[in-house]
């Protein structure tokens, strides 16, 4: 089952046997039955959520017992689309925020993965690292 905002992208993804289109900033109700999925993977999306607490509660509802949520993000974003809690926080504060929301909405202590590529000079001679953060939590 897939979710997104772009019908053309979802149609081209052959992994999904079904999908739906929904803006979670307008409605956090997910059109799936209670305890109907085992995993929820959210990649490069959390940083745009205006109501992550509400959506996390809804994800807990649709996940099976001991279902897992996997949230992955980096320090990249369309900053004009991200809420203040994201734009005004450090990378470490963002990880702590996602952790707090998960725990307060029915998930166990998440496993936190942090990976960084070696810094490289970009065309402006600044050192850039490419961080990757992932939190994996199980529904209690």
Residues covered by each model-derived region:
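A short glycine-rich, Lys/Arg-flanked "PGG" loop and its adjoining helix->strand segment in the class I
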Residues: 53-68
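Conserved class I S-adenosyl-L-methionine
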Residues: 68-99
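Core SAM-dependent methyltransferase catalytic element
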Residues: 106, 120-140
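Class I SAM-dependent methyltransferase SAM/SAH-binding core
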Residues: 1-31
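Short alpha-helix
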Residues: 89-114, 133
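A short SAM/SAH-binding and catalytic strip from SAM-dependent methyltransferases
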Residues: 38-53
């Amino acid at each position: 089952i897939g979710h997104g905002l772009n019908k053309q992208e979802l149609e081209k993804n052959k992994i999904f046997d079904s999908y739906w289109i929904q803006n979670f900033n307008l409605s956090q109700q997910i059109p799936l039955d209670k305890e109907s999925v085992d995993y929820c993977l959210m990649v490069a999306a959390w940083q745009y959520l205006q109501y992550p607490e509400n959506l996390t509660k809804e994800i807990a509802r649709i996940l099976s017992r001991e279902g897992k949520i996997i949230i992955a993000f980096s320090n990249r974003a369309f900053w004009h689309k991200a809420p203040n809690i994201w734009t005004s926080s450090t990378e470490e504060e963002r990880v702590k925020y996602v952790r707090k929301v998960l725990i307060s909405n029915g998930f166990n202590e998440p496993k936190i993965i942090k990976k960084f590529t070696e810094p490289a000079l970009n065309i402006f001679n600044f050192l850039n690292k490419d961080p990757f953060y992932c939190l994996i939590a199980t529904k209690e």
